[in-house]
Amino acid sequence: MELQELAKTLTMAPVSFLEFSLALLCLAVLYYLHVRSRRKNPLIPLDWPVVGMLPALLVNLPRLHDWVTSLLSTTQLNFRLTGPPLSGRHLFFTSDPANVRHVFTSNFPNYPKGTELAEIMDILGGGIFNADGDSWRRQRAKAQLLMSGPRFRAFVSRCSRLKVERDLLPLLDHVAATSTGGVCDLKDVFLRLTFDMTATLVFGVDPGCLTVSFQEVRFARAIDDAMDVLLVRSVLPLSWWKLVRWLGVGYERKMTVARLDIDGFIGDAIAKRRDAVKAGRVIEDDDEDSADLLSSYIDEDDDAVDDVILRDTTMNLMLAGRDTTGSALSWFFYLLTMNPRVESKILAELDTIKATTSTTLDDMVTYDPDELGRLVYLHAALCESLRLYPPVPFEHKGVVAAEALPSGHQVRPGDKIVVSLYAMGRMEAVWGEDCREFRPERWIGEDGKLRYVPSYKFASFNTGPRTCLGKDMAFVQLKVVAAAVVRNFEVEAVPGHVVEPNISIILHMKNGFKARIKRRRQVMNS
C-alpha cells in the first residue's frame, strides 16, 4: 500500500510542478501588464522585482549605444538603470553637459575612477588611467612635462609623416593595384598603422604591424585579446569574473596569455633602453636623436623609477594612443564616403598649402604637419567625426558623497555614473535638430575661424583635470594621415557592406570597413 501511495505521489509531482510554473508565468505576465499600463514612457525598461532592468539591458546589448541614445533622448538626457539588488550594478546614465561639467570639473574630487574600475582594468596596473588622488597627480604632471616639450612634439610630427610616406601610402598603392579590385579593410589598416606609430612614440620601436603581408604581431594580438576580456569584466558582477579568473578558465585564461605577451614585449623594450642609456649610446632614428617617451622616462629618473612603474606607464600610453586614433580614422573615412561634399571641400583646402612630392612613390604627396595645422575645414571635419563617433563612447565615474546633480537627480555612494559621449553627440538638446548630420560647418564661425565649443559639451578628449594629454599629438597624426590619403586616393565604401558600432570599450566597427581604394589622378600643388 505504501508503495502505491509513493508511486501515486511521484506521478503527480510533475503535474504539480507544471501547474506551479504556469502560475508563476501568469503572475509574471500580469505584473508586466500592470506595470506597463502605469508607465508614462513605454521606452523605459521595466524594473522587475528580482532582476531589476537587467533583462532589457541584455536584450538590447547588441545595439547598446543606440539603445542608450534612445533612452537619454526620451528622458531629458538622464536615466537611472537599476540592476539586481545584490549585483552592485546601479548605473546613472547621462548626456547632460551641465552634469558632465559638474562631475568632471566643478566637483571633481567627489567622482573618482574608483577601486572597482582599477580591478577590472588590472592589465593597466597602477598607471595614469587607473590612478586617483596623489598618484594620478604625480603621473599626470610627469607625462605632461614630457609630452608638451618641443623635442617630443617634433618627434611626433617627424615620425607620423615618415610612417605615412614609407608604409601607409605604399601599402594602399599596392592594394589599389591588386586583382581583388583594390578592396581592403580600412579599419584593420588604420589600427595597424596607429599601433606602429604609437609603439614608435612610446618605446622607440616600430613593431612592423603595417605590412603588405598583414602579418600578425603578438604584442598587438595580446592587446586586442586583453581589451575583449576587459569588456566582459565591465558587464559582469565583480565576484563573477573574479571567480572565473581564480579558476583560470574561459576568457580569463586568454587574459593570462595576453598578459605574458604584453609583459614580455614591454620588459624587453625597457631592458634595451636601460642598457642604451647606461652605456651612453645615442639612440638613433634617421640620424636624429630619438625622443620616445620610454627613453625620456629612463633618462630623467635613471634608476629612481623601477621597471614595474615603467611597464604600467608605457602600457597606459600605448593603449591611449593606438586604439583611439585608429578608431577615429576609421569612422572619419567612413563618413567621408557617405558625404562626398565634405571630401571635396577638404581637397580644395589642401590646394591652399604646399605639398611635398615623393620621388619614390610615383608622384604621391605628403604634407608638413605645421602646414596642416593652419587648415580650418580639415580640423572641423575631424571634430565633427569625433562628435558623432567618439573613440571612447562611455566615461565612468564613482561617487564618494551623496549629492544632487545640476539636473536635479540624486546620486549616492555605490552608484556608477556613466556618461554616454556617443549619445551626447546625437542629442537635439545639445547640438540642435541637425545633430545626426555630418556637418563640419557647425565648427566654423562667421569669421571663418574655428568656433569655440566647451569640452564638457564635446568631451571626446575627456574634460576637466583629466583632459587627454595626447590631444595635440592625436590631431597631428589624424591630419597627416587624413590629408595624405584623401589627396592620393579615392576611397569608396563597398556596396552592401554593413558598418555599425561594435560593443567594445573602444568604438570599433563591428564588421570592419571594407573599402575600395583607387589612385587619384589629377594635378596637385607641389
Q: For each of these PLM feature ranges, what is it?
A:
Residues 194, 198, 203, 258, ...:
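Central I-helix of cytochrome P450 enzymes
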Residues 148-152, 227-228, 232, 256-329, ...:
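Conserved cytochrome P450 catalytic core segment spanning the I/J/K helices
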Residues 54-79, 264, 268, 363-407:
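Conserved cytochrome P450 K-helix E-x-x-R motif and the immediately C-terminal K′/meander segment
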Residues 2-138, 159-166, 258-261:
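N-terminal membrane-proximal hinge/A-helix region immediately C-terminal to the signal-anchor transmembrane segment
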Residues 145-146, 320, 443-478, 504:
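Cytochrome P450 heme-thiolate "Cys pocket" and heme-binding signature region
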Residues 340-342, 417, 471-508, 512:
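Cytochrome P450 heme-binding "Cys pocket" and the immediately downstream C-terminal segment
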Residues 2-27, 82-92, 151-162, 173-200, ...:
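Cytochrome P450
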Residues 389, 419-449:
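Conserved cytochrome P450 K-helix/beta-meander segment immediately N-terminal to the heme-binding cysteine loop
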